[in-house]
Structures are given as structure tokens and as C-alpha cells.
């Protein structure tokens, strides 16, 4: 399998179509928010998009998983939260739009994303997990991510129920160092520009082990606004 940086408009359009299909399969029918303050299409346009393919001859239409990555120089932070100004914007990354259409494919494309981030001297990596409906929390927890602030509304997408609530999570410090080290040991080959990562057998990424006693760290307290929103949606 291989992970490719999607460089053409056609490839990136296929990514967006597959992302939408993955969300619809999970019954999360989101639409892009585009107004004077927020533009989800601009966010994706500024991001690097990566797609997973079963082999080097696979066309764009055969993309089976994907994810988006940007640093804060490429596009501003998408959700509010604790201060990160102690680090250069180019060293703080956001991972988003992580989707998969095949078992295990989501993990493989994330391995590709980890390799891309690890080679850029990262200081922090952010992700936003859907509150109450994300099946990725266990995976991100195993990678070393921890909650970062309280749940917030992700205003770049909306559904009939309004803006989705997400839990910001962050990878930093020792956990990030372990990810960088583990990424360098993954079995892959690439070109000089790192535009394509071809995986060899034995792909496995386990940089961080979370003690079961600390699992409670993911049981974050929600804001009153989130609780009120959930009560309103339940009564709708």
C-alpha cells in the first residue's frame, strides 16, 4: 500500500467526495460552512491532503482512506483553546478529515501522516474528535493524544442539528517525541520529496502505551453550553 500527497485538482476533488461518502455512511450529514468569517473549502484548500491506495497503479478513484494536515502558518487554528503561542506556527499541526472505506485503512493513512509530520520538527499536533460519536478516540489515545481544553463547536461544518461538538486533543512533549521516534522506524520507502510513501510488510505504529488507570483522563467535563445543546437536540 502507499500514501500519496494529492497534488492535482482532480485528486483533491476525489478526496472530498470520498470524505463526504464516509460521513454519510456514519449518518453524519455535514455541509461546508462558507461565510465571511469561516470557509471550510478554504481550510481544505490550504491543507495537504493525503490518500491511501492499495498499489502504485491505483487511480485516484480507488482511494480508500485519507486525511488532511496543515500547520498554523498554512491555515489558522480552527478551534479555540489553551494558548500555544510559545511555539512557532509552522511547528504546530492540525490533523483533520480522517476517513476510511476499508478495515485498517484509516490506521495506515495515519501512519503516513505521522511520517510527514515527524520530519518537520513538530512541537504539537492537534486533532478534534466528535463528542459522543467518534470511533477514533481509542486510536488517538493510544497514539498519546490527551484532551486539550473543553469541548467546543466546530464551526466549519454544520448539520440539521447545528454545528458539531468536538473535543480538542493534543500530542506534545514526551508522547510526541515517542511518535517521532516510532515513525522513523516504520517500514517504508519514499522519493526525495516525500510525495509518495510505499509501505513494506510489518507496518505497525504503537509509540505510546496508556495505563488503564489513566483512561479517566478522557472523561472530560463538558461545558454547560454543550449540555444544553445536547438536551435541545434530544428534544427536537
Predicted regions and their residues:
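C-terminal "cap" of GNAT-fold acetyltransferases
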Residues: 156-192, 199, 204-208, 214-215
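A conserved beta-strand-loop-helix scaffold within acyl/acetyltransferase catalytic domains
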Residues: 3-93, 99, 151
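Short, surface-exposed beta-strand/loop "edge" segments at domain boundaries and coil↔beta transitions
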Residues: 58-60, 137-138, 176-179
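C-terminal/domain-terminus segments
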Residues: 10, 117-123, 184-202, 226-228, ...
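Conserved N-terminal entry element of GNAT/NAT acetyltransferase domains
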Residues: 1-13, 197-208
Amino acid at each position: 500500500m502507499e500514501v500519496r500527497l494529492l497534488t492535482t485538482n482532480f485528486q483533491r476533488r476525489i478526496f472530498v467526495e470520498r470524505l463526504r461518502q464516509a460521513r454519510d455512511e456514519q449518518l453524519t450529514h455535514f455541509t461546508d460552512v462558507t461565510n465571511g468569517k469561516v470557509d471550510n473549502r478554504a481550510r481544505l484548500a490550504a491543507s495537504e491532503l493525503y490518500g491511501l491506495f492499495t498499489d502504485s497503479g491505483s487511480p485516484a478513484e480507488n482511494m480508500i482512506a485519507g486525511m488532511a494536515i496543515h500547520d498554523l502558518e498554512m491555515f489558522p487554528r480552527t478551534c479555540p483553546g489553551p494558548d500555544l503561542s510559545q511555539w512557532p506556527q509552522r511547528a504546530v499541526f492540525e490533523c483533520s478529515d480522517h476517513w476510511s472505506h476499508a478495515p485498517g485503512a484509516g490506521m495506515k493513512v495515519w501512519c503516513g501522516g505521522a511520517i510527514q509530520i515527524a520530519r518537520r520538527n513538530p512541537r504539537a499536533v492537534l486533532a478534534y474528535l466528535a463528542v459522543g460519536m467518534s470511533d477514533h478516540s481509542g486510536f488517538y489515545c493510544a497514539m498519546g493524544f490527551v484532551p486539550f481544553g473543553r469541548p467546543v463547536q466546530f464551526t466549519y461544518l454544520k448539520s440539521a442539528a447545528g454545528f458539531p461538538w468536538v473535543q480538542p486533543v493534543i500530542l506534545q512533549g514526551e508522547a510526541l517525541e515517542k511518535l517521532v521516534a516510532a515513525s522513523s522506524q516504520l517500514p517504508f520507502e519514499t522519493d526525495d520529496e516525500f510525495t509518495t510513501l510505499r509501505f513494506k510488510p510489518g507496518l505497525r505504529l504503537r509509540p505510546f502505551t496508556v495505563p488503564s488507570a489513566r483512561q479517566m483522563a478522557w472523561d472530560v467535563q463538558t461545558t454547560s453550553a454543550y449540555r444544553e445543546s445536547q438536551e435541545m437536540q434530544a428534544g427536537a
